[in-house]
UniProtKB/Swiss-Prot annotation:
One of its GO terms (molecular function) is histone binding. Residues 39-53 have a biased composition (Low complexity). GO terms for cellular component: ACF complex; B-WICH complex; CERF complex; CHRAC; chromatin silencing complex; condensed chromosome; fibrillar center; ISWI-type complex. The modification N-acetylserine is found at residue 2. The modification N6-acetyllysine is found at residue 439. The modification Phosphoserine is found at residues 65, 115, 136, 170, 754. GO terms for biological process: antiviral innate immune response; cellular response to leukemia inhibitory factor; chromatin organization; chromatin remodeling; DNA damage response; DNA methylation-dependent constitutive heterochromatin formation; DNA repair; DNA-templated transcription initiation. It comes from Mus musculus. Ubiquitously expressed. This is SWI/SNF-related matrix-associated actin-dependent regulator of chromatin subfamily A member 5. It catalyses: ATP + H2O = ADP + phosphate + H(+). Its EC number is 3.6.4.-. Residues 191-356 form the Helicase ATP-binding domain. Keywords: Acetylation, Chromatin regulator, Chromosome, Hydrolase, Isopeptide bond, Nucleus, Phosphoprotein, Repeat, Ubl conjugation.
């Protein structure tokens, strides 16, 4: 067994048989002093009231009889009596465990508020008449008098002893299999908590069966204590199905129900299932609890079990406040992660469990001296003593000997050429930060870190990085990412070995890329992330775990797939990227490394070499090592260690920057996968050896005291370099200059939009300011160009050679020849230039031009009347004149492609509005009373939220108000609120204008499809009928004669 905090439960009687036994009245309270581990432990007698007596077995309601509701109408005396008995036994038991509890119990008794408004939600406080007893019990400085001792002995002898139960084998009510030895010990520990009126935390490492031990406890309550419920189990939404299946599998006699669904489904469940009371255990999620809190408050709960208990570590959170308001006899917290954040969060959990003991956070913090706790061994021991009665934590390596080991290998990969370009671009954007010249804002640093991590995963996570459109799924998906290259080599080897793989990533868009990759390589896969619906989530897990499953890969987001999921059929875990918190990655590994696993689990962690990822993983490894050194039993870590300072983030960003800047070539090699794995295993072993030699002080500072340090990189000690960082700076790579091509030489100089070249070619000091959108005659630009060339000749300007042009020497020669042969403007040309300067739209500025373009986009190029109204300060005649010239000479504009695309997008929207209006007119026109008769052809897109009556109203009212009217959806929302038809339809009345718009867009799409189908059907029927038959007049009339008259037939 681990050295984890495992408290000694009350010992069984001496005559306890191998099966569960009961010590009745007159049984001795002393005996073998064996705890759950069989070691010596102080005996705790089974005192009166430590469990409900026979008279206390009566339920608040007749739990088994149908038709009776469990709704609480008034306080139940049995319930209150049980609470008072538990309180007295709790104090007595805790004081026998350690005298430290006198510190908490005594002030708690003194400080109990009398006003209900001042009481914190949770368990009832100690009454006034109990204060004196607690004070005398807590005073250990004076010996008791003989009289006091006699009175205590008399009181003890007058108490009726209660039944104590201890299992030495798996209970008979557990049907599907048998509990393992350590699970039986865990069940006994939970039972001892109940018998002593103590609430606790079951903190076994993930995969050790906390779910089964909890279900066994509730089964014990029903079969041995005659308390079937009501119990509540509060779990993450992702594990609801797993909990329900575990109840049915292990203890089928427990009637479990699950509260989940939308508003209507929940209301029906409460009415038909919850209130009638034909159940023992209600399993629900955190979200459902918050939504249905008013219903749950109506019950006197026996056991409240909270899975993933860290959700209530903040006592001010909404969930934490709500669960404290429930009436509960016993509370149990489950967590697979260490209590690692800070002492205040630990107090929050203890306050939830025992608010009458731990009622003051300030007193708790001062007692353990939060700031110095980890450095004071006595305080650490004191913390262990306080935790011992409440916390049970065991580790796989100690209790589950049959579980194969887990082997982790760090695989270091290089950057591809595209990744280096994007990595460089990100660093260059914030080069001032790298060189400590800019403002070091924490959010800015976090953003840089996030962007660099995206680049390490795959450059296609950035918009515009992937070549296309059209987008293709082929080898470029692999070659442009170093991690994908290694993955493409690793997966075929694993498939050949018969392994099955879990791939975890922090980013769901990485899963999108992996999904395309698996389809391209024909790997069968499942996927699970935070957006996966609950039903699909369970279907995927079942499909992957079923016998002889053909699914090879299961890709999961680390946060969504890291809790409450059993994927022990996989034996390989690939961490595509690493989390800041090492516990999150450990939870991901435990999806496969858990009870039921028969193979050695191999974990491959991908790390991009010489990047920020190296520092993130190193920091996580050090933090994990520190967790194992400091307070191993309670797993408490100094709260400051979780915070990343700005200096540390800067060092992470700077790491490898010079290496990335030094080259643009890919670092990906053609090394085979066996060589990559061998090299990774070697580096992993070296890192583990360094960590094992590190002292606690080094771990706290995330530094190494050994000669070989992670800060010693390529022969340089970066700790020493950090001291002189202000004198050094990272030299950015040389900037690549873009060649600036233009049709006209003048616009190359006068209308430059790209980066100016150095040195910039000189221009005459007094040049007229002309813009291309003013549409001056082309002759003017020829004269201005001639003037510029002559000016450069007069100052002796020499054209520099541009290194970016392929024929730089020839271009330089031609440009210089123009300057050398330039002549000044003569009088006629000067006069012509002045005349031409008056022939453009000189009174149109950039603002007028932009308004003109936006008006064309809004109304379309042909609606000149509305366009003229949009351009401020211009008469309709001026706009009409400008519009005519614009459409005639628009190709002279420098950004004409961008401008035309903007206008055409607007015109497309106009056409779309027209087609939608036509579709609505056609649909509404088919009915005389559309508000009552209109039917919508949903097909398979009905949806679950909106009814047909609601959809009918939305379409008809949208048509009535006018689809293209401004703010039409705000008016539609107001119409819904004013309509008596929906006065009780809270769902529809609570929709926002944006939600109504989305629903209307869906309905319009359905209507357009319906109209199209009807038109095609009508065309087909017309074609089937053929042309209309000709008239039969020829039978009665004769053919026309030569003058065009018809002859009559002679009869």
């Amino acid at each position: 067994m681990s050295s984890a905090v495992e408290p000694p439960p009350p010992p069984p009687p001496e005559s306890a048989p191998s099966k569960p036994s009961a010590a009745g009245a007159g049984g001795s309270s002393s005996g073998n002093k064996g705890g759950p581990e069989g070691g010596a432990a102080p005996a705790a007698p089974c005192a009166a009231g430590s469990g409900p007596a026979d008279t206390e077995m009566e339920e608040v309601f007749d739990h088994g009889s149908p038709g009776k509701q469990k709704e609480i109408q008034e306080p139940d005396p049995t319930y209150e009596e049980k609470m008072q008995t538990d309180r007295a036994n709790r104090f007595e038991y805790l004081l026998k465990q350690t005298e430290l509890f006198a510190h908490f119990i005594q002030p708690a008794a003194q400080k109990t508020p009398t006003s209900p408004l001042k009481m914190k939600p949770g368990r009832p406080r100690v009454k006034k008449d109990e204060k004196q007893n607690l004070l005398s019990v807590g005073d250990y400085r004076h010996r008791r008098t003989e009289q006091e001792e006699d009175e205590e002995l008399l009181t003890e002898s007058s108490k009726a002893t209660n039944v104590c139960t201890r299992f030495e084998d798996s209970p008979s009510y557990v049907k599907w299999g048998k509990l393992r030895d350590y699970q039986v010990r865990g069940l006994n520990w939970l039972i001892s908590l109940y018998e002593n009126g103590i609430n606790g935390i079951l903190a076994d490492e993930m995969g050790l069966g906390k779910t089964l031990q909890t279900i066994s406890l509730l089964g014990y309550m029903k079969h041995y204590r005659n308390i079937p419920g009501p119990h509540m189990v509060l779990v993450p939404k992702s594990t609801l199905h797993n909990w329900m299946s575990e109840f049915k599998k292990w203890v089928p006699t427990l009637r479990s129900v699950c509260l989940i669904g939308d508003k209507e489904q929940r209301a029906a469940f409460v009415r038909d299932v919850l209130l009638p009371g034909e159940w023992d255990v209600c399993v629900t999620s955190y979200e459902m609890l918050i939504k249905e809190k008013s219903v749950f408050k109506k019950f006197n709960w026996r056991y409240l079990v909270i899975d993933e208990a860290h959700r209530i570590k903040n006592e001010k959170s909404k969930l934490s406040e709500i669960v404290r308001e429930f009436k509960t006899t016993n509370r149990l917290l489950l967590t697979g992660t260490p209590l690692q954040n800070n002492l205040h969060e630990l107090w929050s959990l203890l306050n939830f469990l025992l608010p009458d003991v731990f009622n003051s956070a300030d007193d708790f913090d001062s007692w353990f001296d939060t700031n110095n706790c980890l450095g004071d061994q006595k305080l650490v021991e004191r913390l262990h003593m306080v935790l011992r009665p409440f916390l049970l934590r065991r580790i796989k390596a100690d209790v589950e000997k049959s579980l194969p080991p887990k082997k982790e290998v760090k695989i270091y990969v290089g950057l591809s050429k595209m990744q280096r370009e994007w990595y460089t671009r990100i660093l260059m954007k914030d080069i001032d930060i790298l060189n400590s010249a800019g403002k070091m804002d924490k959010m800015r640093l976090l953003n840089i870190l996030m962007q660099l991590r995206k680049c390490c995963n795959h450059p296609y996570l950035f918009d515009g990085a992937e070549p296309g459109p059209p987008y293709t799924t082929d080898m470029h998906l692999v070659t442009n990412s170093g991690k994908m290259v290694v993955l493409d080599k690793l997966l075929p080897k694993l498939k050949e070995q018969g392994s099955r793989v879990l791939i975890f990533s922090q980013m769901t868009r990485v899963l999108d890329i992996l999904e395309d990759y698996c389809m391209w390589r024909n790997y069968e896969y499942c996927r699970l992330d935070g957006q996966t619906p609950h039903d699909e989530r369970q279907d995927s897990i079942n499909a992957y775990n079923e016998p002889n499953s053909t699914k090879f890969v299961f890709m999961l987001s680390t946060r969504a797939g890291g809790l409450g999921i059993n994927l022990a059929t996989a034996d390989v875990v690939i961490l595509y990227d690493s989390d800041w918190n090492p516990q999150v990655d450990l939870q991901a590994m435990d999806r496969a490394h858990r009870i039921g696993q028969t193979k050695t689990v191999r974990v491959f962690r991908f790390i991009t070499d010489n990047t920020v990822e190296e520092r993130i993983v190193e920091r996580a490894e050090m933090k994990l090592r520190l967790d194992s050194i400091v307070i191993q039993q309670g797993r408490l870590v100094d709260q400051n260690l979780n915070k990343i300072g700005k200096d540390e983030m800067l060092q992470m960003i700077r790491h490898g920057a010079t290496h990335v800047f030094a080259s643009k070539e890919s670092e990906i090699t053609d090394e085979d996968i066996d060589g990559i794995l061998e090299r990774g295993a070697k580096k992993t072993a070296e890192m583990n050896e360094k960590l094992s030699k590190m002292g606690e002080s080094s771990l706290r500072n995330f530094t190494m005291d050994t000669e070989s340090s992670v800060y010693n990189f390529e022969g340089e000690d970066y700790r020493e370099k950090q001291k002189i960082a202000f004198t050094e700076w990272i030299e950015p790579p040389k900037r690549e200059r873009k060649a600036n091509y233009a049709v006209d030489a003048y616009f190359r100089e006068a209308l430059r939009v790209s980066e100016p070249k150095a040195p910039k070619a000189p221009r005459p000091p007094k040049q007229p300011n002309v813009q291309d959108f003013q549409f001056f005659p082309p002759r003017l630009f020829e004269l201005l160009e001639k003037e510029i060339l002559y000016y450069r000749k007069t100052i002796g300007y020499k054209v520099p050679r541009s290194p970016d042009l392929p024929n730089a020497a020839q271009a330089q020669k031609e440009e210089q020849l123009k300057i050398d042969e330039a002549e000044p403007l003569n009088d006629e040309e000067l006069e012509e230039k002045e005349k031409l300067l008056t022939q453009g739209f000189t009174n149109w500025n950039k603002r007028d031009f932009n308004q003109f373009i936006k008006a064309n986009e809004k109304w379309g190029r042909d609606d000149i009347e509305n366009i003229a109204r949009e351009v401020e300060g211009k008469t309709p005649e001026e706009v009409i004149e400008y519009s005519a010239v614009f459409w005639e000479r628009c190709n002279e504009l420098q950004d004409i492609e961008k401008i035309m695309a903007q206008i055409e997008r607007g015109e497309a929207r106009i056409q779309r509005r027209i087609s939608i209006k036509k579709a609505l007119d056609t649909k509404i026109g088919r009915y005389k009373a559309p508000f009552h008769q209109l039917r919508i052809s949903y097909g398979t897109n009905k949806g679950k939220n909106y009814t047909e009556e609601e959809d009918r109203f939305l379409i008809c009212m949208l048509h009535k108000l006018g689809f293209d009217k401004e703010n039409v959806y705000d008016e539609l929302r107001q119409c819904i609120r004013n309509s008596p038809q929906f006065r009780f339809d809270w769902f529809l009345k609570s929709r926002t204008a944006m939600e109504l718009q989305r629903r209307c867009n869906t309905l319009i799409t359905l209507i357009e499809r319906e109209n199209m189908e009807l038109e095609e059907k009508e065309k087909a029927e017309k074609k089937k009928r053929g042309p209309k038959p000709s008239t039969q007049k020829r039978k009665m009339d004769g053919a026309p004669d030569g003058r065009g008259r018809k002859k009559k037939l002679k009869l």
